[in-house]
Amino acid sequence: MGKKKTSVVQSDELPVIEFRYAEPLFQFVCHPEEPMVVSALATGHVLCHRYDAELLTEKLREARKVQEAVKVEEKKQTLWTVVDVDAADKHPVLPSGVTLLWRTKRHKGSVRALAIDHDGKHVYTIGADNVLKKADTHSGKVVKKVTLDGGSKVTKLVKSATHDFLVMGDEVGTIVVLDSNDLTTKNTLTKIHGGDAINDIFQFCKRSVYKYISLGQTTLAYWDTREPKMKQPKKNSGNQTEEELSNIMCSDDQEDEILCGAFVDPIEGDTLVCGMGEGTLTVWKPKKNDLEDQLTRVKIAKGESIDTVISTLQDDNCVWCGCSNGLLYKVDTKRGKIVEIRKHSGLDEVGMLDLDFEYRLVSGGMDKLKIWEVPKEENSDSDSDSDINDDSEAGLSSSEDSDSDSELGSGSESEVESDASSKSDSDLEECTGSDLPGDIEGSEGENNSNDDDNHDDREELWKELDQPTSDEEEPPKKRSLKVKDKKNKKFKKNENNLSHGITKFDGL
């Protein structure tokens, strides 16, 4: 008797907005309390956009109605709002429902990592210049910065959702814990994954708010961000110190690269999933074997890599997986099945995932970022007023390219810090009111990163882009939480920062 074919649901859900970037997008993060998204580019620019989710959803619904009425057969045009983002464009014309709050040339070279406070008050960035900057999300001004020691490039930056510290991982497997107030170093852990790069970091709050999990090469490790109180000699498998061994627990070799991970329910912390280089999603149970090894695996996409994963935070035992084939897979981890598939891009991989303040899925690759509509069943439970018409058309016809000017304010250049070494901290452009943004001065330097071919590997871009360029700086703002008893869930979301990826750092 043959195997039963499991039917996978090809989703009819569409994005409400799509940002298309002229330069490669390396990182993005959603504000946890307001409809804002901060994006960081390969050129060192950081931009912040605000979007009106209700208006954009209404525009999408109207476009669907038009498609129904005219019965258009062609499916080449998009129904959702599209925003072209060019960091060099100082006077962008944006469609209604979208506002550019600020843009800045924050780092020399590319932006390596990006993080935000659990309340959205501050945003943290680190560039190829190894300068870590903390900026006020409301004003966009840099309030603190520090140049990090060592030549290793940072691959991951996470802000604790509960305490005032940052956790940072680099290319050689070093974890640095910093005080998020003054950016001073509090603790350092070395060679966690045998000297391999840190692919992902997330909090293990069920065990302790100080416990974190890191992924690197073919192993998973969990450790304490605090310094060990005493030496507890353990079996030495290499040249690690006793203190390190007493503070780090490492899994068995998985014989496949572990690229990303997340807890299905970050508060419960009973099930952990990891995206693998060969296209499977491995399932781990801390209570079963203390994370020594995976228990089961779910086949997602053979021959592709799972580059990013995030919980849906909907109490449905599901996670979203972003794959190198440009598809988004919703996986029921309890049943071990794919329950929904969405298409992010036909050319680019999905390298980043996040949830916005109303739990919309946000997917990002090197050329675009999409904020997806909330499914009808989820939206009806929330207290938001954005009613989404969940018709069964999957068509992509009918243009929805409203070019009405958004409200942008004139950029004000504000001297944020007086460090002689930081031109890039002085030029900020804040966009509020109805004026177009003013100029942000500062030479662009040598940024050879116009990504004409979206198939270019990130590792090649790093080589080209990690060259010192001139700096500028700018301001951010804030956003608000949803009412539906989701505050605790949002707390979960903030524990899993979404940017990831070892491949883009290879060869540096």
UniProtKB/Swiss-Prot annotation:
The keyword Ion transport belongs to this UniProt entry's keyword annotation: no
Chief location category: nucleus
Bias (Basic residues) ranges: 478-492
WD repeats (start-end): 62-105, 106-145, 149-188, 193-233, 253-294, 345-382, 431-472
Sequence ranges of Acidic residues compositional bias: 380-393, 441-454
Alphabetically ordered keywords of this record: Nucleus, Repeat, WD repeat
Matching Gene3D superfamilies: YVTN repeat-like/Quinoprotein amine dehydrogenase
Subcellular location: Nucleus, Nucleolus
Repeat found in the keyword field: yes
Residue ranges, compositional bias (Basic and acidic residues): 455-466
Entry's Gene Ontology cellular component terms: nucleolus
Compositionally biased residues, Low complexity: 407-419
Gene Ontology biological process terms in this record: positive regulation of transcription by RNA polymerase I; ribosomal large subunit biogenesis; rRNA processing
Region ranges (Disordered): 376-508
Sequence similarity: Belongs to the WD repeat WDR55 family.
Protein name: WD repeat-containing protein JIP5
